[in-house]
Amino acid sequence: MHTLAALGSVERLQQVVVVVSPDDAHVWPEAPAWPSHFKRIACGGATRAESVFNGLTALLQEGEHNPEGVQAHDWILVHDAARCLITDLEIKRLIDACLDDDVGGLLALPLPDTLKVAVQGRVSQTLPRQDKWLAQTPQMFRAGPLHAALKAKATENFDGITDEASAMEMAGFAPKLVVGSPHNFKVTYPPDFALAEDFLRSRK
């Protein structure tokens, strides 16, 4: 809900779409309190890439019959719901940085730590960190090129695609890196939930 609230406060977003699995359609019940431009599509897949591809397919197909729907040239922001600490300021910064870009881009952070390669629990190599970034979301690309990039890997079960930027890279594009926030971390493990709660309390 924190993610939806942040997205809902960005006036330039014409539509906010939540893609859920058909089996989880009950998880996000219809809520009249949400803005009218919020909608839910129960077409999620087994992976993030498949869910994004299915969602884009549904939106573009709808746009074929509705000129006010999503068109291939429209910008799409894809956000991972596990990054529930995203703020409207970070979303706006990404939009400002990418709106006039030929490709689009993503929020990311320069890698601050030394990066090690492990083999059987021991360090085998230390990698230079100067050119390494940690990818975040949202990631912003035009609907048509992103859909085409994902479609090109659909028959391979989206092998090698870990985010939208990686799909665009495989299609020959170089996404723009936009500095994000360390607070926009992915809530995955139990300690992450406690940390996220602390951050949310500090914002009140």
Task: Say what each PLM segment does.
Residues 1-73, 156:
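Conserved N-terminal catalytic core of the sugar/cofactor nucleotidyltransferase
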Residues 184-204:
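Hydrophobic helical membrane-anchoring modules
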Residues 27-29, 94, 196:
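Hydrophobic packing residues within well-ordered alpha-helices of enzyme cores
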Residues 76:
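Short aromatic/hydrophobic "clamp" motif used to bind/position activated sugar donors
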Residues 85-178:
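Conserved core of the sugar-phosphate nucleotidyltransferase
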Residues 48, 81-85:
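Acidic metal-phosphate-binding loop of nucleotide-sugar-dependent transferases
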Residues 55, 79-80, 110, 142, ...:
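Residue-level signal for inorganic ion chemistry
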Residues 22, 110-113, 182, 191:
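Glycine-rich beta-alpha junction loops
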